[in-house]
Amino acid sequence: MARYKRPTSPKFQRAINMFRLVAGKRPPVRTVLSRGIPCPSFAKAFYSTPQRKIRKPEEGPKIRYLVLVVFASFGLLHFVTTQVDKKAPKNSFTEREFEQYERETGLRRRHKLINHEKNDQYAFYAVPYAHDVSKAVQLLTKMLPNEKQVKVIDPKQLIEKELEDEGKYSYLLQDLLAYKKPLPRGLITALMKQEIELFLNTTKGQFDTNILLMNYPQSTDEAIKFENDVSELKTCIVLEDDFAKSLHDDLSDDDVRKVNNVVGYFDTVGKAEKVNSKVKVLN
């Protein structure tokens, strides 16, 4: 009986290898020399490539990688904190630093016409509403300290003076009066500031003065603007008799509300004072 001879053709060998791969078996590796001649078995140890160890997915990262990640995190945190500290706003400036800051940002400090250092020399008393200005001035002049002179500023007279002198606000006032439009916010305060600035440049303006602002301010916006641009107001005087008898007759409901808001605004900071014929001295 003839002995079975195993086929050795390349096609047959590839088919066998494919079958082994499907079956999960690794086909035998045959080491071949550069000229296609099979090498002896003892040479396989020198020419065969050792199998690499592949880390399984369930194996965790090595400790050195964890250490590197920790150090990198601390380094990044340190970098971020130093950058934030560099950009932290300054709470104090020297005069030169503040001037440089103003030039860079375009901001300007708001300068009052009369700063707090001169509050003892010039005392401003606001009278939001007075039915009869001349009568109210006579009453209040007796209550003010005698050691200071008294100056009275009335917005109505300021408007008449501005129109007569053809000042810088005269054309605006003419248009507003011609069309019976309300005065824009801040205009009365601008006229007040202009009048006070002129007064300070006179001889009388060099002496201690109590300044009565009659029928002013009649809105909280004007009050705030005055204290920002001109000076601090010492007291808001509430003429009790005028408020009780004439306020609603002289002003519209909206204006009454605004005047009461002014009184409430100064009352919250303890600067509102009610005055009647029985009061002898203003605080």
UniProtKB/Swiss-Prot annotation:
GO terms for cellular component: mitochondrial membrane. The lineage of its organism: Eukaryota, Fungi, Dikarya, Ascomycota, Saccharomycotina. Belongs to the AIM36 family. It is found in: Mitochondrion membrane. It comes from Clavispora lusitaniae (strain ATCC 42720). Keywords: Membrane, Mitochondrion, Transit peptide, Transmembrane, Transmembrane helix. It is a single-pass membrane protein. The gene is AIM36. The chain crosses the membrane at residues 63-82. Coiled coil: none annotated. This is Altered inheritance of mitochondria protein 36, mitochondrial.
